[in-house]
């Protein structure tokens, strides 16, 4: 299955003891079938930038650098096609009374535009966008 990893998936994998179901799923996947949105990279970088200078911030910054290198060629940008798709799915979610944050909408639009399934624990955040979903914590 070709998946776009939501930020919560990537963040969970940094924990000393990540969720066992997620860890098993991630280990069983072919790395070339896993993608990141540029939005996820931004969310991770924002999180590290918010930390006070010190060892934890330095370690997480180094990890983020390594993540970007390991997903080289598989970090999908928000281009005009993704932005247009976001406008469509965000408007649909708003019409149904379920507006969602911009970042989630852009991640969903990226997945739709590239024919990917969003891997996330936060299924409720993505359902209004009509994107294919997979919860590696539960499925």
Predicted regions and their residues:
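Short, structured coil segments at secondary-structure junctions
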Residues: 30, 71, 129-130
């Amino acid at each position: 299955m070709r998946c776009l990893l939501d930020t919560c998936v990537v963040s969970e994998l940094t924990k000393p003891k990540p969720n066992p179901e997620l860890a098993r799923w991630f280990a069983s996947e072919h790395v070339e079938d896993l993608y990141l949105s540029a939005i996820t990279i931004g969310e991770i970088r924002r999180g590290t930038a918010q930390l006070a200078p010190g060892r934890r911030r330095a370690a997480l910054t180094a990890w983020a650098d390594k993540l970007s290198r390991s997903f080289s060629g598989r970090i999908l940008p928000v281009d005009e096609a993704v932005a247009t798709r976001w406008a469509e799915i965000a408007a649909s979610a708003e019409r149904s009374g379920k507006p969602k944050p911009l970042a989630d909408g852009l991640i969903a639009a990226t997945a739709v535009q590239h024919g990917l399934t969003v891997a996330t624990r936060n299924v409720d955040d993505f359902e209004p966008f009509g994107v294919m979903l997979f919860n590696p914590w539960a499925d």
